[in-house]
Amino acid sequence: MNFFFIFLFFLTINFSLSTKVISKESWLLDKNLSSIEFELPVLFANNVQGKFEEINGIIEIDLANKENNKAIFSVKINSINMNYKKYKNLLLSDIFFNSYNFPVALVDTKKFSYKNENEFSLEVELTIKGKTEIVPLDIEIIHLANELIQIKTDLDFSRTLFNIGTGKWKSTAILKDKGVIKTNLFLFKQE
């Protein structure tokens, strides 16, 4: 009789551990297919546009109750390619992104609810230059295959809120305040 209870105990432990492992799935960013770009409007000139070459990201989906989902994406600031190449050093300097002291910018969803929608919005934490602000993020999810999804997002941010542009560059008369970050992300399900 004791043996039966011990066996049942270990069987229950094993089942609960395997359920916890199965109840979460991870999706990893394909860095070669994905892109994260930004744009800052400029009065009477071409907008400042850039693309980050070094990006990372992961999404964890809570399959059990769909409430504790998490996603985090980051860019290495000095990996930017931009249309105003002669101003790249200025953009990386302490006047704008200060990439020496703040080499990474990131978006963190914390916990969010997801119930297989194709489009939805979240409030996320955007961290630039060591400053974190809550901003809205519009998300479109395209299921390409069982193990591959595409995520497109639009995120508006205030450059002055993050001190992007100091001194004579703080003015929003020429270089406007509202910036946009657009992503086209491809993620593969982790086995």
Residue ranges: model-predicted function:
Residues 4-13:
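Sec-dependent N-terminal signal peptides
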Residues 17-191:
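Low-complexity, acidic/polar, glycine-enriched regions of mature
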